[in-house]
A protein has these predicted regions:
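N-terminal amphipathic, basic helical "cap/leader" segment at the start of enzyme domains
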Residues: 1-119
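Conserved beta-strand/loop scaffold segments within soluble protein domains that form the structured core
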Residues: 94-251
Length: 251
């Protein structure tokens, strides 16, 4: 086992009791995530998918873990048509079956070490749920999933569910206010049902000292349409991974 892999497994051990108190659904996937990360470690520099991104160098050093009950930029709300926007912990409580159907099943915990690391440390998350046939008026705007703090890794998780014949647009404005070297490790899981429409605009404007690594996994069903836009205006090191599964024909 490489030293940096061992370092992050030991960091998990330091926070394991605290993480154990988080929603059971998140804990359900931790054991598998632990095994995956222990087996794979970080993707190697110059490997097929990481020709220009040295993850071991980015993750090296005495990073601390930023755990939070949620971001000051969002709170849970129920909207007309049954639309829910808010924390994963609240969503699990209100819609346990829907959460169980999608969380941890779109992003590849078994084969993606970065998703495994995110799943291992995820303490909460942000959810957009648009039920069957609902149309989101305008767009949802989110300033940040978690705040930025120097010397810390913020582990950010989002779950977006747009059911059959529903429509939604999500605008991430990632403009952290903190200063100093900081990292955001993000995993977004997106489910788009049959004949549904979803657009994601992800705008980053950060400092030269910030590191942001995002893995976005999308699962599209029959006749669905998805529009993804990632705009980086100012940054330090940014890595945006997109994985799209066209699960049914005409997606």
């Amino acid at each position: 086992m490489e030293a940096i892999t061992k370092q992050y497994l030991e960091l998990f051990a330091e926070h394991s009791l605290e993480l154990r108190e988080r929603p059971q659904l998140l804990g359900h996937y931790r054991e598998g995530a632990y095994d995956t990360f222990a087996r794979l470690g970080l993707p190697r520099f110059k490997s097929e998918d990481y020709q220009r991104t040295d993850l071991a160098k980015l993750f090296a050093g005495d990073w601390k873990l930023l755990l939070s009950e949620g971001s000051p930029y969002w709170a849970s709300h129920a909207f007309p048509q049954g639309i829910f926007i808010g924390s994963l912990s609240d969503f699990v409580r209100l819609y346990p079956e829907v959460a169980k159907e999608h969380y941890g099943r779109i992003a590849s915990v078994e084969t993606d070490a970065l998703v495994a690391l995110n799943t291992l440390f995820a303490a909460d998350g942000f959810v957009v749920y648009v039920p069957r046939g609902a149309k989101m008026p305008g767009h949802i705007e989110l300033r940040s999933i978690l705040p930025s703090r120097a010397g810390h890794i913020s582990v950010e998780r989002a779950l977006i569910i747009v059911e059959d014949d529903a429509e939604a647009t999500l605008y991430f404005e990632d403009c952290p206010e903190g200063t100093g070297r900081a990292m955001a490790l993000r995993t977004l899981e997106v489910y788009v049902g049959r004949r549904a429409r979803f657009a994601l605009i992800d705008r980053e404007e950060s400092s030269a000292e910030r590191i942001r690594i995002t893995s976005t996994y999308v699962r599209q069903m029959k006749q669905s349409a998805v529009n993804l836009s990632a705009l980086t205006l100012a940054n330090g090191t940014t890595r945006n991974n997109f994985f799209i599964t066209l699960a049914e024909e005409e997606a």
